Curated annotation (Swiss-Prot):
A molecular function GO annotation: glycine binding
UniProt protein name: Glycine dehydrogenase (decarboxylating)
Record flagged with keyword Nuclease: no
Keywords: Oxidoreductase, Pyridoxal phosphate
Reaction equation(s) it catalyzes: N(6)-[(R)-lipoyl]-L-lysyl-[glycine-cleavage complex H protein] + glycine + H(+) = N(6)-[(R)-S(8)-aminomethyldihydrolipoyl]-L-lysyl-[glycine-cleavage complex H protein] + CO2
Source domain of life: Bacteria
Cofactor(s), names only, from the UniProt record: pyridoxal 5'-phosphate
Source taxonomy: Bacteria, Pseudomonadati, Pseudomonadota, Gammaproteobacteria, Enterobacterales
Function: The glycine cleavage system catalyzes the degradation of glycine. The P protein binds the alpha-amino group of glycine through its pyridoxal phosphate cofactor; CO(2) is released and the remaining methylamine moiety is then transferred to the lipoamide cofactor of the H protein.
UniProt modified residues of type N6-(pyridoxal phosphate)lysine: K708
Subunit record text: The glycine cleavage system is composed of four proteins: P, T, L and H.
GO cellular component: cytosol; glycine cleavage complex
Annotated source species: Cronobacter sakazakii (strain ATCC BAA-894)
C-alpha cells in the first residue's frame, strides 16, 4: 500500500519517543489489566461526569527539529544587550567543563531529591561543598543546601528571626532602605500574612525603633555602597534583635564575613558563581546561620553521618524539620530547593579555587575602580565613596545618557533618582569599560585604561580597610585540587557515578512524576538568547521571552480549564502559597477577610498545611474513609462548622491515595455552597492532561508542577516551577512585581519570587514538550501513565496488596503497595524493601507517604514495558526473599533485605552471611550493575552528631 506524505513526514515522531511502551507493548499490557483499549481503560477509571469530550486544543504535534527551529526564531527576538543593571543579577562565564559535564548531563539533571542517600552520594558531596563555600564566605556555623532565590531567602530569614527571637511580644521587622527592591517586595508579601509590621529606613535608624524582633541589612547596598555594620550589629544584638545580612558571594571573596561582624543570619544569591541570569532564574540562594539556630533553619541541610559499616557517608540531616513531617508546624513550606544550580555554583568554586576566585573578584573590583576614576576625571560625581562592583553615578541629563546607552546596546540601571547604576561582572573587559566611559561622559574618545589602572592600583580606597577580608577561604583540599580540566572532568564523573538517575533506571517515586526530560527539550536553556537576559531589562529586549511565555501560558490555560495563569512561583510549594494568597485577597476584596479556615484532607501532602499556615490560615483536617476518599459527611460537617469563616479546601486530584474520587465535583459544590474556594493541588496533573482539567472539575485555582507533568527535570532536588492557574475572579489577586509590570495581568499584589516570571529560563523545556506532543500526544501520555500504573498494580497485587483502588479495582497513575502485613508477619519493613531495590538497580518508590508502612509507585508514561517488567520482577523476587525469611531459611537479623544495600568492598571481605555473595550483589544478573558506594545510613547518628561541612579527603578514599 502506498504511504501518504503525511505518514512519511511523521510529525508525531516525538510522541513515540516520549511514550515508553510501543503499540505492541501497550496491547500486551492492556490484556494483562483486562481492558480492550486505552480509551476503554480510561472510561473504567475516570468518572464519566468529569471526562472531556475532546482534549484541549494546543495544536498538532511537531517534530523535535521543527519545534527547535520555531523556538529558535522566537528566541531570536530577544536583544542581547550588555547588562550592567545589577540588582543581584550579573553576567557570568559558566566554565565549559561544568556546562558540558553537568548542566547538559542527564546523570546530573534527571536525579531526584536525595531522600535515598545510598544512591545519592555524588550530589550530596557537591551540595556539602556548596555548604562549605557558604560557611567560609559568610563566617557562620551552619548552612543550608540552597533556597529558591535571594528574595525568598530574605523572607525565610524574617520568619526564622521571629521563630528564634526571645522578644516574644515584638512584632516589627526593620529593613534597610538600600536592600534590593525585589527583596523588599517579597518580604512585605510574607510579612502581611504573618501580621508583621515592616519598617523601611536608613540602616542606622533601626536603633530608633522599639519592639523589633529582627533587622535586615545588605552588606553591599543595592546602589553599590559597601557598609561596615559591625557597630550597628553589636548594638542591635545587645537589644536581643536578630540581625540578618544580605550578601553577595563574589563580593564576600574580598569583603569581611558578616558572621565575623556578628550577623545571626546571612543569605544571598549564588547566581554569579557560574549560573546565567536567564531572565530571572533559576538561581540558588545561600543561607547560613549561627549554630544555636540550626533547628530553626529553613530548607535542606546536608550532614555527615556513618553507614552500617561505620564508614563516612552523607545524608540530608534533620529532616523532621521539613513540611513532610511537621506539616503546618514546619519551619517553612519549602519542598524544592535549587540543587542543580547550587551544584553548578559549588563546582565553580571547586574549579577556580580560592586563588582563582580572588583573581576574578579582584578583577571586577579593579575595573570598577578604573571606571570610577575615569568618570571622576571628567567631573562626574559618584554618590558613594565605597563600592565593590557597582557605581552610582550622578548625571544631570539622565535621559540623554540612557539614550546613548541604548544606542550602544548597553543597559544601565535607570530607576535611581538623579543617577544611573553600573554593575560590573566577571565578563567585563577593557573594551567594555571604554564603552561605558564614552556612554556616560558623552565623549567620543579613547580613555587610557593602563594609566587609570596605575592610578587606582596603589591607592584604592573604595573598600575600607576594615572591610577587607583577612582570613583564608576554601582551604579544604577539594577546592585546591581540581583546577585542570582533566582533573575537573574526572572529579565530576566520579561524583556522577555514585548516583542513580534516569539515565540508568526508572525512578518509580509516587507523587513525583519522574518522566523523560528529552534532550530536545533541554537544548534551548543554554542558548545565549535565553541565558543572557537580565530579568529587569526593557520589555522590548525580551520580546522572544514574552512571546514564549505568552504561548506557554495560553496552552496551560487551555489544559487546566482556567482563565489566567501566573508564572512567578518558582516551586510547587510557592505556587500553593501564591494560590492561597489569591484566595485570601479575593475574600478581603469582598469584605470577608474573616474567612481564614482551610480544610485539608488527612491524606494531603505536607506542603499543603505548611502553605496554608504561611498564608495566615487555620488548618482543619477532613477525614478520609476506608477507601481513602474524602469523607463527605465529615466534609459537610467541617464546612458547616466553619460557616462564614470557611476560606477554602486544598484537595489533590487524583487523590494522594492514587484514585480518582467519584465525588470530586460534590466536594467542590459543598465548599462553594459555604462560600469557600477550591484549591486543587496540581501534583497529580499527569493523570489529568487531555482527559479532564481542574477548571472543568470545578476548582478555582491550582498550581502546576512543571518539573513533574511538563518535563522540567528534577535536577537532583531543584529547580522547580509552580505557576498557578486561576478562574477569572481570582486573576486580579495573583502575584505582581514592584520592578517589572507584568503585561496583561491586572494585579496590584506583592511578589512571591524575586523575578517577575520566576525561573524563566527553564520555561522553554515545557514549551518544547507541549509543542512536540500536541493535543493528542498529551492525552496519550496521560492515558499511558495510567496504563503503566495499572499494569504494575495488576502484576504485583497478589504479592503486595494494593491499598486503595477505585471502580473495578483500578488505580490512577500511581498505586500504593501495603507492606504492613508483611512487616507484621516477618519483621521486614518498607525500608528494607527500598534498600534491597538498590541491589536490583532501582531507586525506591516513595516510602510511608501518604500512609505509613507503604510504598507508592508512579511509573509515568515514559517507561517501556521492558523496564516495568524489570521493576516488577525485582519486586516479585524480593517478595520471594521475604518468604524465605518468613519460612526461617534466613534469620530475621541476617538476610539480604536487612543488610541491603550491598557494596563492592564487602564482597572482597570475609563472608559470613547466611546467603551468597552473588545473591547479595547480583540478584538481577551481572549486566549494567549499579553499585552504591555506601551501605545503609545511620540516621540517628547523623542527627545526634550534626556535622555539615566538608570532611577530610581521606574519608572519601
Amino acid at each position: 500500500m502506498t504511504q501518504t506524505l503525511s505518514h512519511l513526514e511523521n510529525r508525531d515522531a516525538f510522541i513515540e519517543r516520549h511514550i515508553g511502551p510501543g503499540v505492541d507493548q501497550q496491547q500486551e499490557m492492556l490484556r494483562t489489566v483486562g481492558a480492550d483499549s486505552l480509551d476503554a481503560l480510561i472510561s473504567q477509571i475516570v468518572p464519566a461526569d468529569i471526562q472531556l469530550a475532546t482534549p484541549p486544543d494546543v495544536g498538532d504535534a511537531a517534530t523535535e527539529f521543527a519545534a527547535l527551529a520555531e523556538l529558535k526564531a522566537i528566541a531570536g527576538r530577544n536583544k542581547r544587550f550588555k547588562n550592567y543593571i545589577g540588582m543581584g543579577y550579573t553576567a557570568v562565564h559558566t566554565p565549559p567543563v561544568i556546562l558540558r559535564n553537568m548542566l547538559e548531563n542527564p546523570g546530573w539533571y534527571t536525579a531526584y531529591t536525595p531522600y535515598q542517600p545510598e544512591v545519592s552520594q555524588g550530589r550530596l558531596e557537591a551540595l556539602l561543598n556548596f555548604q562549605q563555600v557558604t560557611l567560609d564566605l559568610t563566617g557562620l556555623d551552619i548552612a543550608s543546601a540552597s533556597l529558591l532565590d535571594e528574595a525568598t531567602a530574605a523572607a525565610e530569614a524574617m520568619a526564622m528571626a521571629k521563630r528564634v527571637s526571645k522578644l516574644k511580644n515584638a512584632n516589627r521587622f526593620f529593613v534597610a532602605a538600600d536592600v534590593h527592591p525585589q527583596t523588599l517586595d517579597v518580604v512585605r508579601t510574607r510579612a502581611e500574612t504573618f501580621g508583621f509590621e515592616v519598617i523601611v529606613d536608613d540602616a542606622p535608624k533601626a536603633l530608633d525603633h522599639q519592639d523589633l524582633f529582627g533587622v535586615l541589612l545588605q552588606q553591599v547596598g543595592t546602589t553599590g555602597e559597601v557598609h561596615d555594620y559591625r557597630e550597628l550589629i553589636s548594638e542591635l544584638k545587645s537589644r536581643k534583635v536578630i540581625v540578618s545580612v544580605a550578601a553577595d558571594f563574589m563580593a564576600l571573596v574580598l569583603l569581611t564575613a558578616p558572621g565575623k561582624q556578628g550577623a545571626d543570619i546571612v543569605f544571598g544569591s549564588a547566581q554569579r558563581f557560574g549560573v546565567p541570569m536567564g531572565y530571572g532564574g533559576p538561581h540558588a540562594a545561600f543561607f547560613a546561620a549561627s549554630d544555636e539556630f540550626k533547628r530553626s533553619m529553613p530548607g535542606r541541610i546536608i550532614g555527615v553521618s556513618k553507614d552500617a559499616a561505620g564508614r563516612t557517608a552523607l545524608r540530608m540531616a534533620m529532616q523532621t524539620r521539613e513540611q513532610h513531617i511537621r506539616r503546618e508546624k514546619a519551619n517553612s513550606n519549602i519542598c524544592t530547593s535549587q540543587v542543580l544550580l547550587a551544584n553548578i555554583a559549588s563546582l565553580y568554586a571547586v574549579f577556580h579555587g580560592p586563588a582563582g576566585l580572588k583573581r576574578i573578584a579582584s578583577r571586577i573590583h579593579r575595573f570598577a575602580d578604573i571606571l570610577a576614576a575615569g568618570l571622576q576625571h571628567k567631573g562626574l560625581k559618584l554618590r558613594h565613596a565605597t563600592w565593590f562592583d557597582t557605581l552610582c553615578v550622578e548625571v544631570a541629563d539622565k535621559a540623554t545618557v540612557l539614550a546613548r546607552a541604548e544606542a550602544s546596546e548597553i543597559n544601565l540601571r535607570s530607576d535611581i533618582p538623579g543617577a544611573v547604576g553600573i554593575t560590573l561582572d566577571e565578563t567585563t573587559t577593557r573594551a567594555d569599560v571604554q564603552a561605558l566611559l564614552r556612554v556616560v561622559t558623552g565623549e567620543d574618545a579613547t580613555f587610557d585604561i593602563d594609566a587609570l589602572d596605575k592610578e587606582v592600583a596603589h591607592d584604592s580606597r573604595s573598600i575600607p580597610a576594615a572591610m577587607l577580608r583577612d582570613d583564608a577561604i576554601l582551604t579544604h583540599p577539594v577546592f585546591n585540587r581540581y583546577h585542570s580540566e582533566t582533573e575537573m572532568m574526572r572529579y565530576m564523573h566520579s561524583l556522577e557515578r555514585k548516583d542513580l538517575a534516569l539515565n540508568q533506571a526508572m525512578i518509580p517515586l509516587g507523587s513525583c512524576t519522574m518522566k523523560l526530560n528529552a534532550a530536545a527539550e533541554m537544548i534551548p536553556i543554554t542558548w545565549p538568547e535565553f541565558a543572557e537576559l537580565h530579568p529587569f531589562c526593557p520589555a522590548d529586549q525580551a520580546e522572544g521571552y514574552l512571546q514564549m511565555i505568552s504561548q506557554l501560558s495560553d496552552w496551560l490555560v487551555k489544559l487546566t480549564g482556567y482563565d489566567a495563569l501566573c508564572m512567578q512561583p518558582n516551586s510547587g510549594a510557592q505556587g500553593e502559597y501564591a494560590g492561597l494568597l489569591a484566595i485570601r485577597h479575593y475574600h478581603e476584596s469582598r469584605n470577608e477577610g474573616h474567612r481564614d479556615i482551610c480544610l485539608i484532607p488527612s491524606s494531603a501532602h505536607g506542603t499543603n498545611p505548611a502553605s496554608a499556615q504561611m498564608a495566615g490560615m487555620q488548618v482543619v483536617v477532613v477525614a478520609c474513609d476506608k477507601q481513602g476518599n474524602i469523607d463527605l459527611a465529615d466534609l459537610r460537617a467541617k464546612a458547616e462548622t466553619a460557616g462564614d469563616k470557611l476560606s477554602c479546601i486544598m484537595v489533590t486530584y487524583p487523590s494522594t491515595h492514587g484514585v480518582y474520587e467519584e465525588t470530586i465535583r460534590e466536594v467542590c459544590d459543598i465548599v462553594h455552597q459555604y462560600g469557600g474556594q477550591v484549591y486543587l493541588d496540581g501534583a497529580n496533573m499527569n493523570a489529568q492532561v487531555g482527559i479532564t482539567s481542574p477548571g472543568y472539575i470545578g476548582a478555582d485555582v491550582s498550581h502546576l508542577n512543571l518539573h513533574k507533568t511538563f518535563c522540567i527535570p528534577h535536577g537532583g532536588g531543584g529547580p522547580g516551577m509552580g505557576p498557578i492557574g486561576v478562574k477569572a475572579h481570582l486573576a486580579p489577586f495573583v502575584p505582581g512585581h514592584s520592578v517589572v509590570q507584568i503585561e496583561g495581568m491586572l494585579t496590584s499584589q506583592g511578589a512571591v519570587s524575586a523575578a517577575p516570571f520566576g525561573s524563566a529560563s527553564i520555561l522553554p523545556i515545557s514549551w518544547m514538550y507541549i509543542r512536540m506532543m500536541g493535543s493528542q500526544g498529551l492525552k496519550k501520555a496521560s492515558q499511558t501513565a495510567i496504563l503503566n500504573a495499572n499494569y504494575i498494580a495488576s502484576r504485583l497485587k497478589d504479592a503486595y496488596p494494593v491499598l486503595y483502588t477505585g471502580r473495578d479495582g483500578r488505580v490512577a497513575h500511581e498505586c500504593i503497595l501495603d507492606i504492613r502485613p508483611l512487616k507484621e508477619a516477618t519483621g521486614i519493613s518498607e525500608l528494607d524493601i527500598a534498600k534491597r531495590l538498590i541491589d536490583y538497580g532501582f531507586h525506591a518508590p516513595t516510602m510511608s507517604f501518604p500512609v505509613a508502612g507503604t510504598l507508592m509507585v508512579e511509573p509515568t508514561e515514559s517507561e517501556s514495558k521492558v523496564e516495568l517488567d524489570r521493576f516488577i520482577d525485582a519486586m516479585l523476587a524480593i517478595r520471594g526473599e521475604i518468604d524465605r525469611v518468613a519460612q526461617g531459611e534466613w534469620p530475621q537479623d541476617d538476610n539480604p533485605l536487612v543488610n541491603a544495600p550491598h557494596v563492592q568492598r564487602e564482597l572482597a571481605q570475609e563472608w559470613e552471611h547466611a546467603y551468597s555473595r552473588e545473591l547479595a550483589a547480583f540478584p538481577a544478573g551481572f549486566e549494567n550493575k549499579y553499585w552504591p558506594t555506601v551501605k545503609r545510613l545511620d540516621d540517628v547518628y547523623g542527627d545526634r552528631n550534626l556535622f555539615c561541612s566538608c570532611v577530610p579527603m581521606s574519608e572519601y578514599q
